[in-house]
């Protein structure tokens, strides 16, 4: 109330001052009164503006409420009314016929959309002219009144209706046969006489009634028609029935009756062909009669060779591969190819990975620097692998090619084809790491300079990796400190030239060592270790112990070595008898 009272008092004061200013005609006071007029115009009256704001707000709130109400009604209609309508439609004749009808229900079951029973048995079916009539003749007249005088035996038969014969009782089948209607498959009818080429005719099986049909049966007339001409049915092993006698309770088993022209076909039926039961292995190879030894072909590879005499370059173009075996559970492989120019295995090239295919097309070109005089002693080695993101890559097969000079002189438009031979398990090639060690005894500093890595394992689907190097200072199986390099994107031969410095006292240098891991960086998920190498006085690798001893023998001097990367589980421990780092610790 105090706020409203003060506002009202201020408004009255402004009105009073404005009236006084309006009555005073003096020029001196006119300027002073001008500011009161402006103040009144800005602050008073505010009633219409407030009313407009409230009206606009109410309109917005009302509109939003109407929109929300409409959305809620639409969602309710979609969630509640539509499913109930569909459920009701399927129950009232729009859905399939039920098989749980009582034995008294006739062939009609549920007709139209009303869902009313037209007869308690087949004898009262309207199609057969029985005495039963619909409960509402005004709306649904009997089908007997809609038929032409010719009945079922006329020249214009009714459209065939597809019904489920599995639910018919034995009495219903008998009445069907008595009325002159016979069941048949949905395929065209067989003529009653056994013609040539009909193959084999079987008597109906014992047990009475008709054989169970896996699909919907067709009720057609026995009278010949022109609308549905009879076509010869292809030879099958199903039982063909010519007539059904409901009075017989026991029948002999079905026996083959050879017909004219069908003796040879009858002999072929039922014979076992052993060649069809031999297993087919990956790539279409028979596994039943083969020995399965190494060297079996597992696909083919196409490539082209060319030697450049001016630059001493051997150009290799990998074109495609065909009929590779499936290595994954989905029936495909993720193949890629590595090539070496033997006996040098340090320099290698690798194609891109092709996902989910057994016939990859590569079309990639690589060059090897090799003098012409050495080309006769060199061999080209192709290794086809299946890429696996979370485990070791599977070796599909390999091709070793000699006589390179002779093959390189062939026309370039004639590609070479070779069978990919299945080889034994090959040692995992994870790459190599080049780094130097330098120890300063006076300062107590151990400097590890990571220079470069080569031929790293591809960890990404692009055929590359995002590697970085992590060095850990280890003492008695525990990690004391760790240092990391920068990440090099999309490469298998990164160059770092980065120094990692550790504080190591002179009295402790004989009790520590280094674990150096090359890790593939992933933006999503965990980083994966490509390979590790370890150096120190108690390292399991002799090369790692030699490198450490050479560093101690040459203080203040960097000692550089290449180290082969190995898997973490291959090198079970850091020391010869102690506990090493786990793979999880290496990837951190």
Curated annotation (Swiss-Prot):
Q: Where does Ca(2+) 1 bind?
A: 328, 334, 386-388
| Protein purpose | Ca(2+) sensor involved in Ca(2+)-dependent exocytosis of secretory vesicles through Ca(2+) and phospholipid binding to the C2 domain. Ca(2+) induces binding of the C2-domains to phospholipid membranes and to assembled SNARE-complexes; both actions contribute to triggering exocytosis. Plays a role in dendrite formation by melanocytes.
Main subcellular location: membrane
| SUPFAM superfamilies (alphabetical) | C2 domain (Calcium/lipid-binding domain, CaLB)
Membrane spanning residue stretches: 55-75
On cofactor binding, the record's note says: Binds 3 Ca(2+) ions per subunit. The ions are bound to the C2 domains.
Positions with biased composition (Low complexity): 183-205
Its membrane topology is listed as: Single-pass membrane protein
Q: Which annotated residues bind Ca(2+) 4?
A: 460, 466, 520, 522
Q: Which residues does the record give as Ca(2+) 2 binding sites?
A: 328, 386, 388, 394
What is the required cofactor set for this protein?
A: Ca(2+)
Which Pfam families did the record assign? C2
* Family of this protein: Belongs to the synaptotagmin family.
Describe its assembly: Homodimer; disulfide-linked via the cysteine motif. Can also form heterodimers with SYT6, SYT9 and SYT10.
Q: Name one GO molecular function term.
A: phosphatidylserine binding
Question: Where, in residue ranges, is this chain on the Vesicular side?
Answer: 1-54
Topological domain, Cytoplasmic: which ranges?
76-588
Q: Where in the cell is it found?
A: Cell membrane; Cytoplasmic vesicle, Secretory vesicle membrane
**Omega-N-methylarginine: residues bearing it:** 286
Q: Which residue ranges does the record annotate as region Cysteine motif?
A: 10-34
GO terms under cellular component: exocytic vesicle; plasma membrane; postsynapse; presynapse; synaptic membrane; transport vesicle membrane
What keywords tag this UniProt record?
A: Calcium, Cell membrane, Cytoplasmic vesicle, Differentiation, Disulfide bond, Membrane, Metal-binding, Methylation, Repeat, Transmembrane, Transmembrane helix
Q: What is this protein called?
A: Synaptotagmin-3
- The organism of origin for this protein: Rattus norvegicus
Specify the effect of residue 334 to N.
Abolishes Ca(2+)-dependent phospholipid-binding
Region described as Disordered: 129-161, 183-222, 238-257
* Ranges for domain C2: 297-418, 429-563
């Amino acid at each position: 109330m105090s706020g409203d009272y003060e506002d009202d008092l201020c408004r009255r004061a402004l009105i009073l001052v404005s009236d006084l200013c309006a009555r005073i005609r003096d020029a001196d006071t006119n300027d002073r009164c001008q500011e009161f007029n402006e103040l009144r115009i800005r602050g008073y009256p505010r009633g219409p503006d407030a009313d407009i704001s409230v009206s606009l707000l109410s309109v917005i709130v009302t509109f939003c409420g109407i929109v929300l109400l409409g959305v809620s009604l639409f969602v309710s209609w979609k969630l509640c009314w539509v499913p109930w309508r569909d459920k009701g439609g399927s129950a009232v004749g729009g859905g399939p016929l039920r098989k749980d009808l009582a034995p008294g229900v006739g062939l009609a079951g549920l007709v139209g959309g009303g869902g009313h029973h037209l007869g308690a048995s087949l004898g009262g079916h309207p199609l057969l002219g029985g005495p039963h009539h619909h409960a509402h003749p005004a709306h649904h007249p009997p089908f007997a009144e809609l038929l032409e005088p010719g009945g079922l035996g006329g020249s214009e038969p009714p459209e065939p209706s597809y019904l489920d014969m599995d639910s018919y009782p034995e009495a219903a089948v008998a009445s069907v046969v008595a009325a002159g209607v016979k069941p048949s498959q949905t395929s065209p009818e067989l003529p009653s006489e056994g013609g040539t080429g009909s193959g084999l005719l079987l008597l109906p099986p014992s047990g009475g009634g008709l054989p169970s049909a896996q699909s919907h049966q067709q009720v057609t007339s026995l009278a010949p028609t022109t609308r549905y001409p009879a076509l010869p049915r292809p030879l099958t092993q199903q039982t063909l029935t010519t007539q059904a006698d409901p009075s017989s309770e026991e029948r002999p088993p079905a026996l083959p009756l050879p017909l004219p022209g069908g003796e040879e076909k009858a002999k072929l039926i039922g014979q076992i062909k052993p060649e069809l039961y031999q297993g087919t292995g990956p790539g279409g190879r028979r596994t039943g009669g083969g020995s399965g030894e190494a060297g079996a072909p597992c696909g083919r590879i196409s490539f082209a060779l060319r030697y450049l005499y001016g630059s001493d370059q051997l150009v290799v173009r990998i074109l495609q591969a065909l009929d590779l075996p499936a290595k994954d559970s989905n029936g495909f492989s993720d193949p890629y190819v590595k090539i070496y120019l033997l006996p040098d295995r340090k320099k290698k090239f690798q194609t891109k990975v092709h996902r989910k295919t057994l016939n990859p097309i590569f079309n990639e070109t690589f060059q090897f620097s090799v003098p012409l005089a050495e080309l006769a002693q060199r061999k080209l080695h192709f290794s086809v692998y299946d890429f696996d993101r979370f485990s070791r890559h599977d070796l599909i097969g390999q091709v070793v090619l000699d006589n390179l000079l002779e093959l390189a002189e062939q026309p370039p438009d004639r590609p070479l084809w070779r069978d990919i031979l299945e080889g034994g398990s090959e040692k995992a090639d994870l790459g190599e790491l080049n780094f130097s060690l330098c120890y300063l005894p006076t300062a107590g500093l151990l400097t590890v300079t990571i220079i470069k890595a080569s031929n790293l394992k591809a960890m990404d689907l692009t055929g590359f990796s995002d590697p970085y190097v992590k060095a850990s200072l280890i003492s008695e199986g525990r990690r004391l400190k760790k240092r990391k390099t920068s990440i090099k994107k999309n490469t298998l031969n990164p160059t770092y030239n980065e120094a990692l410095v550790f504080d190591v006292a002179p009295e402790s240098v004989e009790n520590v060592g280094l674990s150096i891991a090359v890790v593939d960086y992933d933006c999503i998920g965990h980083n994966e270790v490509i390979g590790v190498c370890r150096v120190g006085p108690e390292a399991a690798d002799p090369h790692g112990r030699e490198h450490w001893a050479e560093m101690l023998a040459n203080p203040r001097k960097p000692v550089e070595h290449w180290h082969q990367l190995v898997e973490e589980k291959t090198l079970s421990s850091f020391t010869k008898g102690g506990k090493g780092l786990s793979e999880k610790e290496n990837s951190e």
